[in-house]
Amino acid sequence: MRRYVCVFFFLLAGLLARGQEAYTDLVRQGMDALAMDSLSQAEASFRAAMSKEPTHHGNSELFRYLGRIKERQEKNSEALEMYTSGLNLSPNNVELRLDRAALYYRMGNQARAASDYSDVIDLQSTNMEALQMRAHIRASMHDYKGARADYETMLVAEPHNESALVGLVLVNDRSGRPREAMEQISALISVYPRRALFYAIRGGMEQRRKQYEQALADLTQAIELEPSCADYYVSRATLYLEMRKRRLARADTQMAVRLGADPREMASLLK
């Protein structure tokens, strides 16, 4: 009897090993297909792997790959289902949750995106992507206190994090602390005098204050430092229009189009 039991377990181990090998082969085939942009073939391989080993610990990652495939196919609802299925298997998978949060955000569901980013922060308190995106969402929903807290958390972990530095300036500017915001952006410019973005941000702040000459000087400086950035030409064109300098605005929109801006948007700007 003992001999038959041993044979049974030997056969079972062999079957499990072959099943694992087949699963691995299918996953490898799927990854190879992804590398060749054969999305349908990759999807078929990943689904076959999960059918063969429905309880495999790696299936949550396969759902993540399937979600990304669906996103590339512009099937966002199906992508969301894939990410959610993966999280049902592995709720603490940070990368999966970040992917779903980003998709929620692109689909316009900021509340669910913020919820997923909060879950990531509960798992990793200094996850920069989650903190930055939650701060951005909070600011867009006028929760400036919450946004400021997230940016400050980022700066404790990374004191020179540019996204947090800029985000804090913009939050202060929008939340009734304009003097502090202007002092902060000017301090950044004094430390990083060759950073075009900072001049563009200060120029925008000055424009909102109707300090047109200062704004023009800063936006022109941004263009001189980074002449290939279409956004800076668009910003200066908007300023020129407020200053009733339509010819100069038109010249900047034409340059922006040459640098990749949407011609229809530029035409609409000049109407």
Feature names for model-found ranges:
Residues A17-Y65, R72, K271:
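N-terminal leader/linker segments that initiate helical-solenoid repeat arrays
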Residues A35-M36, I69-R72, R106-M107, S140-M141, ...:
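Register position in tetratricopeptide repeats
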Residues E61-Y65, D99, M133, G167, ...:
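Canonical tetratricopeptide repeat
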Residues K52-T55, L89, L123, A157, ...:
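Structural marker of alpha-solenoid helical repeat scaffolds
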Residues Y23-T24, H57-E61, V94-E95, M128-E129, ...:
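Helix-start (N-cap) detector for alpha-helical repeat units in TPR-like alpha-solenoids
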